[in-house]
């Protein structure tokens, strides 16, 4: 595996020059109708920058950032080792380090740094410990806490009716939004905090109702070098 956060130009070119069957499965392309944000379109733009044929600007960054990370493009991809979503993430991380960032990202990144949630203070501290130690820790996720807190209440009721010993933690965002906005260092800090708090809870199993958080815990944390302390 290439060094984390290192763009693989060969893989970008493989995608850029492919017949692009994946374009049929890209939800961003289906909604926008813009070839520039099709999987191969984004790969072409990123490859051009990597070869110094183009330089980053807000228009290019906006196009390359139009990726949901759904990985639908991998289903029909003829290159088994190509993960375009990761290559685009690496590109955005490189852009951020070079000082390029979309203004719309900055308020959310600042909220993550200050409150541990992209939504700001209104979600900070909403999930607090209800038991010192338990077999199960329930992780609500910052989007749930901000937009649908009733999901947390319902999950607690289910766990209690099932007789499950559970706890909540004063959770931070899982870190995936920070990665998608190019700040891998911040994503790693959030991951480290969550791993510490979960380990301190004494739980052996983590349950979450957020699919994005589940994917981040199961796939991104190991990739970032964090050993997740529970199943």
What is each residue range found by the language model?
Residues 1-64:
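Ferredoxin-type iron-sulfur electron-transfer modules and their immediate structural context
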Residues 43-226:
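Iron-sulfur-cluster electron-transfer modules
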Residues 227-231:
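Short, intrinsically disordered, charge-balanced linker/junction segments flanking boundaries
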């Amino acid at each position: 595996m290439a060094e984390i956060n290192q763009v693989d130009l060969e893989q970008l070119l493989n995608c850029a020059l492919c017949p692009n069957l994946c374009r049929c499965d890209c939800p961003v392309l289906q909604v926008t109708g813009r070839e520039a944000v099709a999987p191969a379109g984004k790969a072409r733009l990123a490859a051009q920058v990597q070869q110094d044929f183009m330089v980053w600007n807000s228009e290019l960054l906006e196009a390359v950032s139009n990726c949901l990370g759904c990985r639908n493009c991998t289903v029909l991809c003829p290159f088994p080792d190509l993960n375009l979503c990761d290559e685009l993430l690496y590109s955005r991380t490189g852009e951020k380090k070079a000082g390029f960032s979309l203004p719309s990202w900055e308020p959310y990144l600042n909220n993550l740094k200050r409150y541990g949630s992209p939504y700001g203070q209104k979600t900070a501290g909403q999930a607090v410990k209800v038991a010192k130690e338990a077999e199960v820790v329930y992780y609500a996720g910052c989007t749930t806490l901000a937009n649908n807190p009733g999901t947390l209440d319902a999950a607690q009721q289910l766990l209690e009716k099932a007789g499950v010993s559970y706890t909540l933690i004063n959770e931070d965002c899982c870190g995936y939004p920070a990665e998608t906005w190019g700040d891998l260092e911040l994503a790693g800090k959030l991951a480290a905090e969550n791993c510490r708090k979960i380990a301190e809870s004494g739980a052996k199993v983590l349950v979450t109702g957020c699919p994005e958080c589940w994917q981040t815990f199961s796939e991104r944390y190991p990739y970032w070098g964090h050993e997740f302390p529970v199943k």
